[in-house]
Amino acid sequence: MQLIEKAPAKINLSLDALYQHTDGEFEWQMIMTSIDLADYVQITLQDSPQIEVRTSKGYLPEDKRNLAYQAAQLLRHRFDIKTGAIIEIDKHIPVAAGLGGGSSDAAAVLRGLNQLWHLGLTEAELAHIGLSIDSDVPYCVYSETALVTGKGDQIQPLGDLPNFWMVVVKPEVSVSTPRILHALNCDQITDRPQTDRLLAGIQQQDAQQMTAAMANVLTPITNQRYPQIDYLMQRLTAFGAEKAQMSGSGPTVFGICRQYSRAQRIYNSMSGFCREVYLVQPLKK
């Protein structure tokens, strides 16, 4: 048996850290959406008990370091599955970009094997299992616009966003998320997103109100280490984006436009600064 699961990239429309738990984990409040830039994960069952991962990018790990591999092994051991699977990942999402590519691949494996192994798990149950793999996996199980709270495990779907385009730009730097989070002090945050206003903008389908309320509290930390990220955000707004922001811990940034023609011009302009530039839209449910 075989199936193909789409694994969309995620974008942080807002990212706020409310406080740090005694175990070192943060209490998050984020609004996330998925975009029409995606990996494709083909899963084929096999009689042997092995989990095999193959990727279209030769430099990616295909062993237990790969989150998709971890997802398959986790389900297999938890439910005492005797068979194995071949997982082939066609990569399109930039790697180490703050777009949740690895987490989305893992979530796709959870969804796919839930069907192929006839486990009958709900999205909420898959999300709970996924939290032990990576904090972005619970959201990626749903892959729709949502308010994400707790340690990343509490997902509240919000419905579709108002219509707009995004120009997504990934600079040629790699950011270590643990290093960024290690430098995060919740008591020193000054520029937080206006989450209630952002939620209202989504509910009212008001893109202008929505973008005015967006922010990412990790931006100053990442900018300090990688000033080219701030430069790219300045370029996005200079070329006409209504809002420019970093996704996750970076390094990827994105600009929002309500008009396709303007977004296309920004895309063309930014392509002169970076090799990895994408013109995308948020997914509709």
Curated annotation (Swiss-Prot):
Active site: K10, D136
Uppermost EC category: transferase
UniProt record, GO biological process: isopentenyl diphosphate biosynthetic process, methylerythritol 4-phosphate pathway; terpenoid biosynthetic process
Annotated EC: 2.7.1.148
Job description of the protein: Catalyzes the phosphorylation of the position 2 hydroxy group of 4-diphosphocytidyl-2C-methyl-D-erythritol.
NCBIfam families: ispE
Pfam families (UniProt xref): GHMP_kinases_C, GHMP_kinases_N
Gene symbol of the encoding locus: ispE
The name this protein goes by in its record: 4-diphosphocytidyl-2-C-methyl-D-erythritol kinase
HAMAP family cross-referenced by the UniProt entry: IspE
